[in-house]
Amino acid sequence: GGISVPGPMGPSGPRGLPGPPGPGPQGFQGPPGEPGEPGSGPMGPRGPPGPPGKNGDDGEAGKPGRPGERGPPGPQGARGLPGTAGLPGMKGHRGFSGLDGAKGDAGPAGPKGEPGSPGENGAPGQMGPRGLPGERGRPGASGPAGARGNDGAAGAAGPPGPTGPAGPPGFPGAVGAKGEAGPQGARGSEGPQGVRGEPGPPGPAGAAGPAGNPGADGQPGAKGANGAPGIAGAPGFPGRGPSGPQGPSGPGPKGNSGEPGAPGSKGDTGAKGEPGPTGIQGPPGPAGEEGKRGARGEPGPTGLPGPPGERGGPGSRGFPGADGVAGPKGPAGERGSPGPAGPKGSPGEAGRPGEAGLPGAKGLTGSPGSPGPDGKTGPPGPAGQDGRPGPPGPPGARGQAGVMGFPGPKGAAGEPGKAGERGVPGPPGAVGPAGKDGEAGAQGPPGPAGPAGERGEQGPAGPGFQGLPGPAGPPGEAGKPGEQGVPGDLGAPGPSGARGERGFPGERGVQGPPGPAGPRGAPGNDGAKGDAGAPGAPGSQGAPGLQGMPGERGAAGLPGPKGDRGDAGPKGADGAPGKDGVRGLTGPIGPPGPAGAPGDKGESGPSGPAGPTGARGAPGDRGEPGPPGPAGFAGPPGADGQPGAKGEPGDAGAKGDAGPPGPAGPTGPPGPIGNVGAPGPKGARGSAGPPGATGFPGAAGRVGPPGPSGNAGPGPPGPVGKEGGKGPRGETGPAGRPGEVGPPGPPGPGEKGSPGADGPAGAPGTPGPQGIGQRGVVGLPGQRGERGFPGLPGPSGEPGKQGPSGSSGERGPPGPVGPPGLAGPPGESGREGSPGAEGSPGRDGSPGPKGDRGETGPGPPGAPGAPGAPGPVGPAGKSGDRGETGPAGPAGPAGPAGARGPAGPQGPRGDKGETGEQGDRGIKGHRGFSGLQGPAGPPGSPGEQGPSGASGPAGPRGPPGSAGSPGKDGLNGLPGPIGPPGPRGRTGDAGPVGPPGPPGPPGPPGPP
């Protein structure tokens, strides 16, 4: 046995189905060899963590080799265009795990090539139906990423055991359609690094099997949200090459690594759980530190060694695919039963080392799990419930009072306006620096392979809970619907940082504080959709990332412009009758009649009896009602005020139609619950309505008591004169002053005023203080809820002030002169004319209400004269108070009776008539309808980022995935060495009697 010189490591082929166990007995373990010197090539990129195996027994520690120096990182590879999606293949049955071959001596490590660019993502899963979009808030800025911890140093490997013969190759399954990704689980910290066992004796290196054909990558479509990780399939036994001869003791060159055994196919994905209610999704928080590695699994029995294979050259990494759009989480597939294993392929020749590739961008962190065909796409999850309405803005100021009109019927609601422009998402937070990788320890010889681990049960659900929705804010003022904005461009993902060197395991860093919120971007236009790129090679599955912290609540959207004023509604119902108008003035008194001719002077006769009281005049016709005064401003509908002075309330103003709802603000993640804004200023009280039509006239006043009789003059009584003739009619006295206006009568039938126009809207109130929201739990994006019902109408305003009375109606035309009124109190007697020369006939006093005729006082004795003939009786003057009797003149010689003296001054005014009956109170106008609720105001300002919520529970297992396409047949393995003889088998049962054989040849003749 010479020392086998290892060739460079070739790229790993696709994982085949495990073959059934071979029939050979287990080989004997060779003596342990000395560990080889470690290679000095650069360390390659770290692969995704595999499923933890069972812990093997720790062997004796091998001597560690020198750590190789790490080469400089290559430049970042360009990002590939998304390829077209591949068709999902049928899923193959699961094969049995083959036994591993023993690993040969490790040779010195060759120079490590530069890491290739990451492969593109596979075909996306089917998107579930999109829910109605919720309102979108402004995204908060991502917090800074936490620093990555250092990886622990690897322990020495234990010695390998003998391997069994390889089984026949299994058929590769077709690639299944990628299932919908579930929510990304929180990344657990890695377990502690297992202790590497002491290296066993290296066997001869087996020849490497030929690399399988890589499956064609599907075109990456929209990236689905990460699904719940499926249950990992049991890994196949690692293959080991046959042990080489014992090398010389001391640090010799490292042997070639044996070909890995065919991996077991991935089990069917468990049934996909129903998606839970969606929470409010926040931006991802800072990345957590990488956990420690898990303990190493127990080694299984080693198979028989195979011939060493040559390493193939490294494959080129594909360009990373663009991130797809996250789809709703589909149900997990059910677990499938394992299929029979295929035979192990024969090792291929070692390939030459490939050139170092450029480092690719760091792939997205994937869910853990053994690689295998994905499960079938689950049915889309149920539609989410309606999203909660955003917090309303502060109430606007009450507008000025409009003209009060009659309430009209409620107008139809305006059409809702288009949604406002969508805001641009904020820039992503800065990526934290990656920790340096520690230097790798020396590779010891491989230990015996452990048995295949059982498939692990699905882990328990994480402790997260659905975030509770915050309370709704105060209702905002209706805004004018804005134009629908075009969606903003999706921000381009930032470049991934180069991977740092691997350092020693560092302590777990403390999570840094969340970064400040990024500024809100202006709404962008939708960018043109990029062409699909060529499919890239599948990328490695990364370890699951930590649960991100929920982002800050989006800032409040700006309030939309105030809606246009709605058209005036139709004329409202008749309002209550108005107050009585002012009573019309009394018509003028007719002109005086012509004076009679003077009669002969007669003797003064005795005082005649009082004349009869004139008939009561009929009430005059009512004047035309004056036009209603100008309408006052309508006040807002208020609570019923205290009834004012008795009068009929004015008609209520018609409420104008509500303006169309304002545009919806930009949708964003719901912000934190803001404090209720301060109420807006109270609107001014509206003026009272216009005065009502003139009421009916009040009842006629009652007749006043008669006036006092005049006192007799002081002169001595004169001689009784002869009854004179009727004197000439006196002149008509001046018109009496009009009576006072009576109390308002009952409501008149006047027309109602037209509805007043709405007053201008008041200024918006000041926004409320910024609320401090608790940090929400990261949830899945909810499907958009249906539109909420309009809010309840706001509370009624205070009652409006009573408006000023309307102006008096115009004076109506004088009515026709009515019949004479009731007789007034008798006037005082007129004074006699002075005796002597015959005076000119006195003028009649001004007519008043007809009163009793005053007694004539005795005049002073006049000079005796011839008795005059009685004068003719003058026509009765218009009824009016008789003037007071003048003082008696000085005594003179009795003369003939003088002519009738002038009428005395008008008597006192009669008592005011009784107040007419109070008119019935007018019907109260109904309160105006409450205005339609305005659209929600701008959302409140964003609250501070709340603490990270616990992880949500894991969903139930999904349905089984589709069968993968069968893999290519592997090459037949080399026959293993003949094992030791087995135990003796038991004697078999006697078989059935066979048919008689053919007759034999005749025997020799017998002895004579």
UniProtKB/Swiss-Prot annotation:
What are the Pro residues biased-composition ranges?
159-171, 660-672, 813-823, 858-873, 993-1008
Residue positions the entry lists as glycosylated: K91, K924
The record's account of tissue expression is: Expressed in bones.
- Coiled coil feature spans: none
Quote the subcellular location field of this record: Secreted; Secreted, Extracellular space; Secreted, Extracellular space, Extracellular matrix
* One GO location term (cellular component): cytoplasm
Region annotation (Disordered) maps to 1-1008
Subunit annotation = Trimers of one alpha 2(I) and two alpha 1(I) chains.
Query: Where does the record place the modification 3-hydroxyproline?
Result: P705, P980, P995, P998, P1001
Where does the UniProt entry say this protein principally localizes?
secreted
Q: Where is the composition biased (Low complexity)?
A: 105-121, 139-157, 205-235, 362-388, 397-416, 475-484, 519-547, 604-618, 631-658, 687-703, 731-740, 752-764, 825-840, 894-908, 942-975
PTM notes: Contains mostly 4-hydroxyproline. Proline residues at the third position of the tripeptide repeating unit (G-X-Y) are hydroxylated in some or all of the chains. Contains 3-hydroxyproline at a few sites. This modification occurs on the first proline residue in the sequence motif Gly-Pro-Hyp, where Hyp is 4-hydroxyproline.
Record family assignment:
Belongs to the fibrillar collagen family.
> Residue spans with biased composition (Gly residues)?
236-255, 309-318
Q: Which keywords appear in this protein's UniProt record, sorted alphabetically?
A: Extinct organism protein, Extracellular matrix, Glycoprotein, Hydroxylation, Phosphoprotein, Secreted
Q: Which residues carry this modification: 5-hydroxylysine?
A: K91, K254, K329, K571, K682, K850, K912, K924
This protein is called: Collagen alpha-1(I) chain
Q: Which Gene Ontology MF annotations are present? A: extracellular matrix structural constituent conferring tensile strength
Bias class Basic and acidic residues marks the residues at 55-69, 909-923
Protein's UniProt keywords contain Phosphoprotein: yes
What job does this protein perform? Type I collagen is a member of group I collagen (fibrillar forming collagen).
In Gene Ontology terms, what is a biological process of this protein?
response to mechanical stimulus
Species of origin: Paramylodon harlani
Name the InterPro entries on file.
Collagen, Collagen_superfamily
Q: Which residues carry this modification: Phosphoserine?
A: S97, S607
